[in-house]
């Protein structure tokens, strides 16, 4: 019986991890509220001389039509040099640009940051010859989100 339970746990755990990986998002937990995390991220974007496009507060928009939504914000930002390089590899990646970072509160009240995994975009758009740019974008996204989420 213990062997069956252990086997099921392993199988279900593997299935769960696959489902998480397949959605193409990287998600980390923040030590701050959604709003504070998004504020910190926006400041980091500006400090790095990236292009800040806009910030969308979906919860505020929901409240405007008398609906409720846990805190949910999106920041659109980018770097025209990196974005252009990616689009030159696969023009269809433009549908996923500029970069987006999602700041949200889960059902347990924990603040999270999610963003598109650049390597998932590579696969999704059949990108060739952009590994160096993808590596830089991936590293930058990881650093920005970690800094915004840290105490």
What are these regions (language model features)?
Residues 1-7:
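Positively charged n-region of N-terminal signal peptides that target proteins for export
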Residues 21-50:
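Terminal, regulation- and interaction-focused segments at domain boundaries
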Residues 14-18:
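N-terminal signal peptide c-region/cleavage motif recognized by signal peptidases
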Residues 117-151:
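C-terminal partner/receptor-binding element of secreted or periplasmic proteins
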Residues 100-127:
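Beta-strand/loop substructures that line and gate deep hydrophobic ligand-binding cavities in soluble
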Residues 7-9, 19:
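Cleavable N-terminal signal peptides
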Residues 42, 46, 57-99, 103:
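Compact, glycine-rich, soluble single-domain proteins
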Residues 53, 70-72, 96, 108, ...:
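Extracytoplasmic
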